[in-house]
């Protein structure tokens, strides 16, 4: 069995490559609108097509990992993801671009599932949220790199070049991750009524509600930060700087919140999840006000907003995995991630419509309310010590 450090590094690198497109495409949102003639709502659909594909396939990816083994499932998923991105790069309409990104998302679904299962097996409870935090840090890391790289690539070779580079990264890192996983043994047999037992686990449904509320806030910030900053009269460079700031905040916060949640042998998970929502709610209100001030205020409040709005998911995922028997941890993660991914994809077009019809002030107030509601729901989660 490969060492925990090697697997964590490989899982994180593969996840960063996936996020280069799935979370970084917003960095060239204005260019996509111009090239494909998209409305704000249509742009939202394009930006989350990859996430939607992954969300629809996560549970199936869990079954594939159990049935085929982590290595074979990861190689197959990587091949499909690469093909989808190449098809998207060659598309000439918004609908074909959406389809290619959707197919790619289906393929990439195996990366987070295989990674989470491997980390649950290799890390004890007192280090597990930290390890998931490192892996989840790779999501905004990919977005941070793409915030710089995608606009530069688009300027040189258009959207086509940006997507082809993304395809190459997904292919190379996916293969490397599969090799790092090694020949892990497959489960002896299927767990009977696995998904029913996961959904009936103590506090699982409430945890999923928290995830639904929090991910709407996350998508609001990631997908519409750049258009909001531009609409407030700031330059494209300021908007890019704000997007980069949010991604840096996400990278730091996921490790910090994960470390905090590991305290008391993992007994601080619920309190940490509540605190992320409270910080996000306050950050949303501060950011809304800062858009009427100067550059420094926008960047500072974007940092605070991102620290809460993008820092919760590693804690939520590890809590989901710990509410099921250890042999079902990967599938339990997949269930939680499915809900989060699908809601993130479905909510983004309506969020764009909200901004277009109600304005950005109302938009950010709504996100603050949703973050606060998530924190209130999280308060009543069962406080259990993970095994």
Where does each model-flagged region fall?
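C-terminal transmembrane helical hairpin of 12-TM major facilitator-type secondary transporters
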Residues: 269-316
């Amino acid at each position: 069995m490969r060492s925990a450090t090697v697997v964590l590094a490989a899982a994180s690198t593969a996840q960063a490559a996936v996020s280069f497109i799935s979370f970084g495409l917003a960095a060239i949102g204005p260019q996509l609108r111009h090239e494909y003639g998209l409305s704000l709502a249509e742009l939202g659909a394009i930006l989350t097509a990859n996430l939607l594909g992954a969300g629809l396939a996560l549970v199936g990816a869990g079954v594939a990992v159990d049935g085929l083994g982590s290595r074979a499932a990861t190689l197959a998923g990587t091949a499909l993801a690469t093909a989808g991105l190449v098809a998207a790069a060659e598309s000439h309409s918004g609908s074909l671009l959406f389809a290619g990104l959707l197919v790619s998302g289906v393929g990439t679904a195996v990366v987070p599932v295989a990674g989470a299962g491997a980390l649950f097996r290799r890390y004890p409870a007192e280090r597990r949220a930290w390890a998931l935090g490192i892996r989840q840090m790779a999501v905004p890391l990919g977005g941070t790199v793409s915030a710089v790289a995608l606009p530069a690539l688009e300027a040189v070779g258009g959207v086509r070049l940006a997507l082809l580079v993304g395809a190459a990264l997904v292919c190379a890192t996916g293969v490397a991750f599969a090799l790092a996983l090694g020949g892990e043994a497959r489960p002896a047999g299927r767990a009977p009524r696995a998904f029913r037992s996961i959904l009936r686990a103590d506090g699982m449904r409430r945890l999923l509600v928290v995830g639904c509320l929090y991910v709407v806030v996350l998508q609001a910030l990631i997908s519409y930060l750049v258009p909001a900053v531009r609409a407030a009269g700031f330059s494209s460079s300021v908007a890019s700087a704000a997007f980069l700031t949010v991604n840096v905040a996400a990278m730091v916060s996921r490790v910090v919140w994960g470390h905090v949640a590991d305290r008391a042998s993992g007994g601080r998970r619920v309190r940490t999840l509540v605190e992320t929502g409270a910080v996000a709610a306050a950050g949303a209100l501060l950011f809304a006000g800062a858009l009427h001030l100067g550059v420094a205020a926008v960047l500072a409040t974007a940092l605070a907003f991102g620290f809460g709005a993008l820092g919760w998911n590693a804690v939520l995922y590890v809590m989901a995995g710990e509410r099921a028997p250890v042999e079902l941890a990967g599938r339990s993660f997949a269930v939680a991630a499915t809900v989060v991914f699908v809601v993130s994809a479905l909510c983004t077009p309506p969020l764009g419509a909200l901004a277009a019809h109600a304005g950005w002030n109302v938009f950010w107030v709504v996100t603050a309310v949703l973050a606060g509601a998530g924190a209130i729901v999280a308060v009543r989660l069962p406080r259990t010590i993970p095994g």
